[in-house]
């Protein structure tokens, strides 16, 4: 070691060497300091000053720091920028260090926690309404498994996951961090990173299934995992790696994880990554939660209810009984608005039980986590009392039963805690007066020392009969009893001398003490510290009582979330005039008056109504496909998306925006809409489209719903038409699924006469005086043109370009009608002049316009105005 290295810096270097992959927050008094490369990286990431402290190997030591009291905000910034942070705390005070090792002793420090994206628990570092998942992927002899947990709520699950399903499942969960074996191929690690998760490679030993089983059995205090499920080796391996990582990052203080729940992919509606993105389930394409389906659905009052909504929306059920039970619960609150309003008013006061419990388990909780548990359980009890006398559907009845069973803990917390505890335990004042006699005494001595002394003085005056007796204080004797020499004689002799102990005689005064006064003096001098120490002990006692009831608290949290979600979906259904879908085992798909929930909500803000449309894709024994044609901007993509969204909403457990809906269970939803490239992988927009289409054709089963928008548009016309044609035939003949297929290749409409399960539909438009009016109505039939030039005009292309485009279009269409070759037609077109073509002459005024110009509204009677309106209507038709 360099002889010039100070003991403190030697300690830092030793601790840093043990945590090379993390920024080290090294506690020094009221600050966390960072040194060397850590300081350079942190200063840049946090935009704070970079300074220096001493030298090492002849070079200045870079240094920066952040205040300990506001460290969480800096931690959040660093975590979001991809850093891992080691929290290195002082484990003793300087005075203790000096007693241990002399004046040059260094305060003992240890890393108490590694902060990573998937291991956050503090409210300030988390999104209250979203899970913060840590996931782990294991591959054992070609068998894959995915495990995930949220240590801030205790949620812990696992499922078998073939490599081909890893991307879609991670897209469903949106974990913040994914643990993988360091032998996992780089391409797959990059794919995980593209989903927005941090990838943390671990050694193969972390995934060893034998040691993993031992870790899990030890965590849950069982001899075997068979009571939790029949886990495959890969599942055990993935779960074990999670526990191993938590032991590493939490330094042995493991979170409260519920027993692992085995999840089956067959019981969830399958949605791949592209479909989730295209349908904007939880995040809009523009980024953020706003204008996503989740934002439109969410009327929950609690954080737990919001997380449950996201979990179900990202993983809708395919179990008919489960779906119907959820609909029945929503229907109850949809019908009984008084009970729902009363429930929601109570739910607004419910804190986040799960996260408060998790922080207490990890010893990161404070007084307000105790009060959060108290307030949450009190609210649960009030709701239970109100709802247990109501005739509820089975799912809600079970939720209400979950709210019970914690009366003793609730009574304890009600008695022990003040109404509004402090944020920090060190501030004191969390225990209610009257709960603990010794604490009350300490507080009284601390806050009312003078009055206690005065009371004691009055007692002594009465006991001695010496009215001149006083209790005084100085820095030498402390508290003492003083009286004149004249009266002292009485106190120096029995029986009073047995109680009053002589301490000092001065020229005119005699001073005494008593055992009671000496004890009181000690108590007064130490009362403040004693009160804090008693509260610390009581805090730990209450924390232990809460942790002993963790199962009941978790159960209550789940019951509250279920009630909240059912009521929230009912409120949203009432607001939007939504209907309960009829769910069936067959392949029915009949929706009348369907509306896009997100678009409708956006239009409503501007006072515009949404044009509803029907959809019938019912199929038994074969495919049911609608081929949709029509112009751009007419609403084809909206129509495709809305029907897919209604399926997802229905199988989530929500009502749907429609007049009525009958939906046979859907196993998969695939969406190929929109345009995007993947430049990082060298993929063009067309290549991305083809990859997504290939996924659909290879994976869609006969219970899938597929929506395809303009397949083949990114290449030459005949190439694109050929691909679209073959894709449609494959969906019909091989996949035999329900599908909506939008295209501008009008030639494909002829397939309806050849494919039994194919019908044509078009989005209606109206032409009026050279303008196109989009009616947004889906009707049977086929479009004969796409109105691309008119849409280009609406987009603001220069008039010269529009005029030239119309000339070219007319020539091409004429060539097709006359059977000429396209090249010959193009060769016959006049060259585009260098000067812009003259703007088209204004069209002559129509009869309607001429009549309107001649009208003077103020001079017309109501009858004349009505007659004129009928005349104008006749002219239009």
From Swiss-Prot:
Similarity annotation: Belongs to the DNA mismatch repair MutS family.
One term under GO cellular component: cytosol
GO terms, biological process: mismatch repair
Classification via PANTHER family: DNA MISMATCH REPAIR PROTEIN MSH1, MITOCHONDRIAL, DNA MISMATCH REPAIR PROTEIN MUTS FAMILY MEMBER
Gene3D superfamilies for the chain: 1.10.1420.10, 6.10.140.430, DNA repair protein MutS, domain I, MutS, connector domain, P-loop containing nucleotide triphosphate hydrolases
Upper taxonomic lineage: Bacteria, Pseudomonadati, Pseudomonadota, Alphaproteobacteria, Rhodobacterales
Binding sites annotated in the UniProt record for ATP: 630-637
One Pfam family linked to the record: MutS_III
HAMAP family, per database record: MutS
Protein name: DNA mismatch repair protein MutS
GO MF annotation list: ATP binding; ATP-dependent DNA damage sensor activity; damaged DNA binding; mismatched DNA binding
Keywords: ATP-binding, DNA damage, DNA repair, DNA-binding, Nucleotide-binding
PROSITE patterns reported for this sequence: DNA_MISMATCH_REPAIR_2
Function summary: This protein is involved in the repair of mismatches in DNA. It is possible that it carries out the mismatch recognition step. This protein has a weak ATPase activity.
InterPro entries listed in its UniProt record: DNA_mismatch_repair_MutS, DNA_mismatch_repair_MutS-lik_N, DNA_mismatch_repair_MutS/MSH, DNA_mismatch_repair_MutS_C, DNA_mismatch_repair_MutS_clamp, DNA_mismatch_repair_MutS_core, DNA_mismatch_repair_MutS_N, DNA_mismatch_repair_MutS_sf
């Amino acid at each position: 070691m360099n002889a010039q290295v100070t003991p403190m810096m030697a300690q830092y270097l030793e601790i840093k060497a043990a945590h090379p992959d993390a920024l080290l927050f090294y506690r020094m008094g009221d600050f966390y300091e960072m040194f060397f490369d850590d300081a350079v990286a942190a200063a840049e990431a946090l935009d704070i000053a970079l300074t220096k402290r001493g030298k090492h190997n002849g070079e200045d030591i870079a240094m920066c720091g952040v205040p300990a009291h506001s460290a969480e905000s800096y931690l959040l910034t660093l975590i979001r920028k991809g850093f891992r942070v080691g929290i290195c705390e002082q484990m003793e005070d300087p005075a203790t260090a000096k007693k241990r090792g002399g004046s040059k002793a260094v305060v003992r420090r240890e890393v108490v926690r590694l902060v990573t994206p998937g291991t956050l628990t503090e409210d300030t570092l988390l999104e209250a309404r979203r899970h913060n998942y840590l996931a782990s992927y294991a591959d054992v002899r070609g068998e894959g498994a995915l495990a995930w947990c949220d240590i801030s709520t205790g949620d812990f699950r696992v499922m078998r996951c073939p490599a081909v399903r890893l991307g879609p499942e991670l897209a469903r969960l949106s974990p913040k961090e994914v643990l993988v074996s360091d032998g996992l191929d780089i391409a797959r690690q990059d794919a995980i990173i593209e989903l927005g998760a941090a990838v943390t490679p671990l050694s193969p030993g972390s995934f060893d299934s034998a040691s993993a089983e031992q870790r899990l059995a030890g965590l849950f205090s069982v001899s075997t995992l068979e009571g939790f499920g029949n886990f495959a080796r890969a599942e055990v391996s993935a779960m074990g790696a999670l526990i191993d990582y938590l032991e590493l990052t939490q330094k042995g203080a493991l979170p409260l994880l519920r027993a692992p729940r085995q999840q089956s992919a067959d019981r969830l509606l399958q949605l791949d990554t592209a479909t989730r993105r295209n349908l904007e389930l939880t995040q809009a394409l523009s980024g953020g939660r706003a204008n996503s389906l989740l934002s439109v659905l969410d009327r929950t009052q609690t954080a737990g209810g919001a997380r449950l909504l996201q979990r179900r929306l990202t993983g809708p059920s395919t179990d008919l009984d489960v779906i119907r039970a959820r609909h029945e619960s929503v229907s109850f609150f949809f019908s009984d608005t008084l009970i729902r309003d009363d429930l929601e008013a109570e739910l607004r006061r419910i804190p986040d039980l799960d996260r408060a419990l998790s922080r207490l388990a990890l010893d990161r909780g404070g007084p307000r986590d105790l009060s959060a548990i108290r307030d949450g359980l009190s609210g649960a009890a009030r709701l239970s009392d109100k709802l247990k006398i109501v005739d509820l559907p089975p799912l809600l009845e079970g939720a209400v039963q979950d709210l019970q069973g914690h009366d003793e803990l609730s009574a304890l917390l009600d008695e022990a805690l003040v109404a509004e505890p402090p944020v920090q335990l060190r501030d004191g004042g969390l225990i209610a007066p009257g709960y603990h006699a010794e604490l009350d005494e300490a507080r009284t001595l601390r806050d009312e020392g003078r009055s206690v002394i005065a009371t004691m003085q009055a007692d002594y005056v009465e006991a001695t009969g010496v009215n001149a007796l006083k209790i005084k204080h100085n820095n030498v004797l402390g508290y003492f009893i003083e009286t004149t020499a004249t009266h002292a004689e009485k106190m120096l002799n029995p029986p009073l001398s047995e109680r009053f102990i002589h301490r000092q005689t001065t020229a005119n005064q005699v001073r005494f003490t008593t055992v009671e006064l000496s004890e009181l003096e000690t108590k007064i001098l130490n009362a403040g510290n004693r009160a804090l120490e008693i509260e610390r002990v009581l805090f730990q006692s209450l924390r232990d009582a809460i942790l002993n009831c963790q199962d009941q608290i978790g159960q209550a949290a789940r019951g509250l979330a279920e009630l909240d979600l059912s009521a929230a979906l009912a409120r949203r259904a009432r607001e939007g005039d939504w209907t309960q879908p009829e769910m069936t085992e067959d392949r029915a798909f009949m929706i009348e008056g369907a509306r896009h929930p997100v678009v409708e909500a956006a239009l409503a803000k501007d006072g515009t109504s949404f044009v509803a449309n029907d959809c019938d894709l019912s199929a038994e024994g074969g495919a049911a496909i609608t081929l949709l044609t029509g112009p751009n901007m007419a609403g084809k993509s909206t129509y495709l998306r809305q029907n897919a969204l209604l399926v997802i909403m229905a199988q989530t457990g929500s009502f749907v925006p429609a007049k009525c809906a009958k939906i046979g269970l859907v196993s998969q939803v695939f969406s190929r809409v929109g345009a995007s490239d993947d430049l990082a992988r060298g993929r063009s927009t067309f290549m991305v489209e083809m990859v997504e289409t290939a996924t659909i054709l290879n994976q869609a089963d006969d219970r899938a719903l597929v929506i395809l928008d303009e397949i083949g548009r990114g290449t030459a016309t005949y190439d694109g038409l050929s691909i679209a044609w073959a894709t449609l035939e494959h969906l019909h003949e091989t996949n035999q699924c329900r599908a909506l297929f939008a295209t501008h290749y009008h030639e494909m409409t002829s397939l309806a006469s050849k494919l039994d399960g194919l019908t044509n539909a078009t989005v209606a438009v109206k032409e009026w005086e050279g303008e196109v009016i989009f009616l947004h109505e889906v009707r049977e039939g086929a479009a004969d043109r796409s109105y691309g030039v008119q849409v280009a005009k609406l987009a603001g292309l220069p008039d010269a370009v529009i005029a030239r485009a119309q000339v070219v279009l007319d020539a091409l269409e004429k060539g097709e009608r006359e059977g000429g070759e396209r090249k010959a037609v193009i060769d016959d077109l006049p060259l585009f002049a260098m000067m812009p073509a003259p703007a088209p002459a204004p069209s002559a005024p129509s009869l309607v316009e001429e009549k309107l110009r001649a009208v003077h509204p103020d001079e017309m009677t109501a009858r004349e105005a009505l007659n004129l309106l009928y005349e104008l209507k006749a002219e239009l038709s």
